[in-house]
């Protein structure tokens, strides 16, 4: 099923009993987090809060959509897949696009033509009139306090925009970048843009500043659009492909865009709400603290201020929001689903990898478990280094455990068995110092710089040990088959 906009997706979820409308008055201050957290942990439906209320008890004018991607199945639906397992096919497509192989012959070349044709036919379609510009607030009418922006945790410093798709463009790029960066509300037309220095939006901004140090930098933030575009912004799309183009591929139809009223950036035409504005040179503000996906409040730091010059929206717009906290939360669920996309990407580069798993308890990306077909001494260490360096998404992964392909990486009992029986803590532990680390990781000795640990829990080969290696106990297949045949008679 393909969805042309967020409302289309909501309608399908509701039809299938996967969305619940909440008519009771609920406050964005803490209450929505409490409800959404309980529902997510119970693997419950998406939530549409129809009557969000302000601190004075009056009603906001717009409903709030929460827990949209609260199950891996809904993530798969949003990406146009029939099931979570089908996400591997999307990963295979991305792997091919990242490093296309020369055709092995005429037949192979023709077999690839439909995919390539589909991709390049998915260039966005720019329209002149769009639903997202049905209502326009400008000048003094711009008031972010009229939006039901969620205040997620008791010690959060202020309300926080959490699901905004930030649209930027570098000075030498035709391709626009989509990124999701949290934004602290500090005034009726002011948000703090918390993007880390390595992220696409920050890189675009830095390049612009070098060439135009005294010129305001145009930015747009999209709140609520079709699921393919939202999920395209968190998927490792090859640099040669725009997120809008990838969203069209997922959706099976071109992404409709419209030019912003106040700048040349293009935004999804059927988005619910769009914030247009600029970042003025050298205007920064102290951001945080906020509770984040680690389950802790993070430290404060200075980030650019986004001045909102214009708010455009659909008639009766829906505000899309989430919270982040100790796993499981929505980012952790997204990690579980997108894990299936990552596997083919890694296997393209390292065919010896048989499976890859990001445990949700590891805050989406901080720990990975990899299984492989080991072929030589030191092979596991090569795979560790490859995982850390191949995809930007794993640059901040602190721990990698490598096991043989007889171990199920998604079963902690098996992983712990391999670690405790196939590892020597000194010989098989790899420590790397002074590597890039998530700014939110307060455990690192220096902000943004810390260590990594690799655990080689594979069987050891000659050159790695001189000792006789243990043989795994296996049952006799004939006896197993015999007992299977009489099991019901035994009454056990």
Curated annotation (Swiss-Prot):
Keywords: Cell membrane, Decarboxylase, Flavoprotein, FMN, Lyase, Manganese, Membrane, Metal-binding, Ubiquinone biosynthesis. Pathway: Cofactor biosynthesis; ubiquinone biosynthesis. Binds 1 prenylated FMN per subunit. It is a peripheral membrane protein. It comes from the Bacteria. GO terms for biological process: ubiquinone biosynthetic process. Gene3D superfamilies: Single helix bin, UbiD C-terminal domain-like. Its cofactor is prenylated FMN; Mn(2+). It is found in: Cell membrane. Its main location: membrane. HAMAP family: UbiD. Belongs to the UbiD family. This is 3-octaprenyl-4-hydroxybenzoate carboxy-lyase. It comes from Neisseria meningitidis serogroup B (strain ATCC BAA-335 / MC58).
